[in-house]
């Protein structure tokens, strides 16, 4: 059966690479820090939308929604929407250039009969006739082209979000009109756009015109939830002013500061020393053939002085996107050949992960505006002698590339015990003189750097430069940033898992039911389960190891060892003096299950609660006493296998979490039954119990004493077709005793026959089980 995969994951021994353990320590180890926020802290949460990433020197990153700002008067810049959040009736804003453009927007609450109201606009008392027979607010845009003219209503916005917008762009003033959620923009001409100023009477926001689609979304649907909390305090518009400072080579600058957090700009010069690692593998035989010459990641630790401070640094150099070359001197055993040797040319990248023990790397968690400037370095290859048993030795000689800085991001370096947040510098390559060749062969005048001797007797290659970043750190320097190590790695994985969960849940509609039953009957092992993923056999083995490592911490794995005791205790704790009738056994609140099952009274509540607890343990009992019938875990594993094969996003990093979650979350509503002679006792995870005869499917009293005796000795059967479905099937179609018995035993062949006959009741039941396979 397909549930064999779960049994293998529970029972098989496995090995774990040291790198896997180190990666787990880095991503899961947490440190709890208690911080008392001061009186000026607006929220108790860490900031959102912070993350690692490269920002070029010439790039300015703007927020989508900047604000809120207090009511003010200013001359708005062009290409920026001013979004105003009106909270009362009256004047929302006034705008003019004192030449050919005067406009004022007034808010009118819902259900207002025609009435004349007095408004103070541009220092004058004006009377406007307003009305609003809508359930929404109305914003009347009153306009005049001269100070001598009277205002008239140019356009109206009917809105339930109480937001209005104004934009200076292209020689025109743009606003919104119509009715939400389908309000659109319209414009007014003016000959003097630059001098238009605005008087804002409510809180306002600033949105770049490049994000006009978001502005349209806010106008029609309202602000995001974080902007609707009273903890967000409006600031003065002057806070947008930037104080420019010329940064020194090595210094920390406080950009902003509150009682809890502060932004520190960190500027450092840096010396990067790195070395290439390689691996040379010789084939067996007579000694004339080599298997591979390849690049490997190499670590290097060193010390240097930075402004009089002794710095201990650690680098890891790796290569991505190598070119594979080969040389074959002939087919004889004594002909020299190299099956594969790697060469880096223009297309690969070299990555150097850098970490040092200075203060700059102590709180490198929330980082923005990360940039660096590094010089280039030329790497020239040396010679490598292929020592043949007889004859002249071929020599791979020469080759050169230059490394040019191409970007920087946050990364994680792994030591023997912990993971460290570090900087990853990316270098692009250009080929350089001299070319490389293999002397004594016809291979010559090739450009690039082969992996045979990339360091050329150099202890290291050195790159100098500087980097700058803005880091969010606790205001108190004695605090460590309260977040897990390697947070960026885990956040990336969580984003991948979120996307994968959505894809998995959407695939439920595409599963063919008849094929699912056939797949559920197959003995799925780890290789067949993961073989649908596009990968090599070695990667499949690695994925299976990762899945087992994750699965051992699942709720299913931790519960299986305690199954016997917990099942026995839970069963014996139920009262043995009361029988329960099915139709009165449903209790609405099953969440308050007692942790101490020994303190049980004879009340109906306690019996039903214990029954619900027992039903959750029956899955574990079923797994170790498998019958010939189909189980919920067979369907769960079959659906999981189908979705893995159909998925386009599954990978080595996400597979362990998905398999573990599937074992715990697929088909949460289950029913299990015990069969004794001609009577069936059925119980589900919601605490409902049924007892009925096989011949008539009529209910009989549920005997707790009998159930407690049978549960430890009789096999447990998954109620794929539960009692209600059986009853419905018999009432509408009529079934024989043999058919009923086979359905009670979850016979897969009988289930397949009903599905092939397109029986709507059975098909609907199976469809509901498939739809329960969600993460």
Curated annotation (Swiss-Prot):
Gene3D superfamilies associated with the record: 1.20.5.170, 2.60.120.200
Ranges for region Spike foot: 509-775
A Pfam family it matches: VP4_haemagglut
Motif YGL motif: where in chain: 447-449
An individual GO BP term: permeabilization of host organelle membrane involved in viral entry into host cell
InterPro entries in alphabetical order: ConA-like_dom_sf (IPR013320), Rota_A_VP4 (IPR042546), Rota_VP4_MID (IPR035330), Rota_VP4_MID_sf (IPR038017), VP4_concanavalin-like (IPR000416), VP4_helical (IPR035329)
A GO cellular component entry from the record: host cell endoplasmic reticulum-Golgi intermediate compartment
Protein name as annotated: Outer capsid protein VP4
Organism (species): Rotavirus A (strain RVA/Human/Japan/YO/1977/G3P1A[8])
């Amino acid at each position: 059966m397909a549930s064999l995969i779960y049994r293998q994951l529970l029972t098989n021994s496995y090995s774990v690479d040291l790198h896997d353990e180190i990666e787990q320590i880095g991503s899961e180890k947490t440190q709890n820090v208690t911080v008392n926020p001061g009186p000026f802290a607006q929220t108790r949460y860490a900031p959102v939308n912070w993350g690692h990433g490269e920002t070029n020197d010439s790039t300015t990153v703007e927020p989508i929604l900047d604000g809120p700002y207090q009511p003010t008067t200013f001359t708005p810049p062009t290409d920026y929407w001013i979004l105003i959040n009106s909270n009362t009736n009256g004047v929302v804003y006034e705008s003019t250039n004192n030449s050919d453009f005067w406009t004022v927007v007034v808010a009118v609450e819902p259900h207002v009969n025609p009435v004349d109201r007095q408004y103070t606009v541009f220092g004058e008392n004006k009377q406007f006739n307003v009305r609003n027979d809508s359930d929404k607010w109305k914003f009347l845009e009153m306009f005049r082209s001269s100070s001598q003219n009277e205002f008239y209503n140019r356009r109206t916005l009917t809105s339930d979000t109480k937001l209005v917008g104004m934009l200076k762009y292209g020689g025109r003033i743009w606003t919104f009109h119509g009715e939400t959620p389908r309000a659109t923009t319209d414009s007014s001409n003016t000959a003097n756009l630059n001098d238009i100023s605005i008087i804002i009477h409510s809180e306002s926001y600033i949105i770049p015109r490049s994000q006009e689609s978001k502005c349209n979304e806010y106008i029609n649907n309202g602000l995001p939830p974080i902007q609707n909390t009273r903890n967000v305090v409006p600031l003065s518009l002057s806070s947008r002013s930037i104080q420019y400072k010329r940064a020194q080579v090595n210094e920390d600058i406080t950009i902003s500061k509150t009682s809890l957090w502060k932004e520190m700009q960190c500027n450092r010069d840096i010396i990067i020393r790195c070395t290439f690692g390689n691996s040379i593998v010789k084939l067996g035989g007579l000694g004339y053939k080599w298997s591979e010459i390849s690049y490997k990641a190499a670590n290097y630790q060193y010390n240097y002085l930075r402004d009089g401070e002794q710095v201990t640094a650690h680098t890891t150099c790796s290569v991505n996107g190598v070119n594979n070359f080969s040389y074959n001197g002939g087919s004889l055993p004594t002909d020299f050949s190299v099956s594969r040797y790697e060469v880096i040319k223009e297309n690969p990248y070299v990555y150097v992960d850098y970490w040092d023990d200075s203060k700059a790397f102590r709180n490198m968690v929330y980082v923005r505006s990360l940039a660096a400037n590094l010089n280039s370095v030329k790497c020239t290859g040396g010679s490598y002698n292929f020592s043949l048993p007889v004859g002249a030795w071929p020599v791979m000689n020469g080759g050169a590339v230059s490394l040019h800085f191409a970007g920087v991001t946050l990364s994680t370096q792994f030591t023997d015990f912990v993971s460290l947040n570090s900087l990853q510098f990316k270098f692009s390559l250009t080929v350089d003189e001299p070319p490389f060749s293999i002397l004594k062969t016809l291979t010559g005048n090739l450009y690039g750097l082969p992996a045979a001797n990339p360091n050329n007797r150099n202890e290291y290659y050195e790159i100098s430069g500087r980097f700058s970043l803005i880091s969010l750190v606790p205001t108190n320097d004695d605090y460590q940033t309260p977040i897990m190590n390697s947070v960026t790695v885990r956040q990336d994985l969580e984003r991948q898992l979120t996307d994968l969960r959505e894809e998995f849940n959407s695939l439920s509609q595409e599963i063919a039911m008849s094929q699912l039953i056939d797949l559920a009957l197959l003995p799925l092992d780890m290789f067949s389960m993961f073989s649908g993923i596009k990968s090599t056999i070695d990667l499949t083995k690695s994925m299976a190891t990762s899945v087992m490592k994750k699965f051992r911490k699942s709720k299913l794995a931790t519960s299986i060892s305690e199954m016997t005791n917990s099942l026995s205790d839970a069963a014996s704790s139920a009262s043995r003096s009361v029988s329960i009738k099915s139709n009165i056994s449903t209790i609405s609140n099953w969440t308050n299950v007692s942790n101490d099952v020994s303190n049980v009274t004879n009340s109906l509540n306690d019996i039903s609660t214990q029954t619900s607890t027992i039903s959750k343990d029956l899955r574990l009992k079923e797994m170790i006493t498998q019958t010939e019938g189909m189980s919920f875990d067979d369907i769960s594993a079959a659906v999981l296998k189908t979705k893995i094969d159909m998925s386009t996003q599954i990978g080595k990093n996400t597979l362990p979490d998905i398999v573990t979650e599937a074992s715990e979350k697929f088909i949460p509503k289950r029913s299990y039954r015990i069969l004794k002679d001609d009577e069936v006792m059925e119980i589900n995870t919601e605490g409902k119990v049924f007892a009925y005869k096989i011949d008539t499917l009529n209910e009989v009293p549920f005997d707790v004493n009998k159930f407690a005796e049978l549960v430890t000795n009789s096999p447990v059967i998954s109620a794929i077709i539960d009692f209600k479905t059986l009853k419905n099937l018999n009432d509408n179609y009529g079934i024989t005793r043999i058919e009923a018995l086979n359905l009670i035993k979850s016979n897969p062949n009988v289930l397949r026959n009903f599905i092939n006959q397109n029986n709507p009741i059975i098909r609907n039941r199976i469809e509901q089980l498939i739809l329960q396979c969600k993460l």
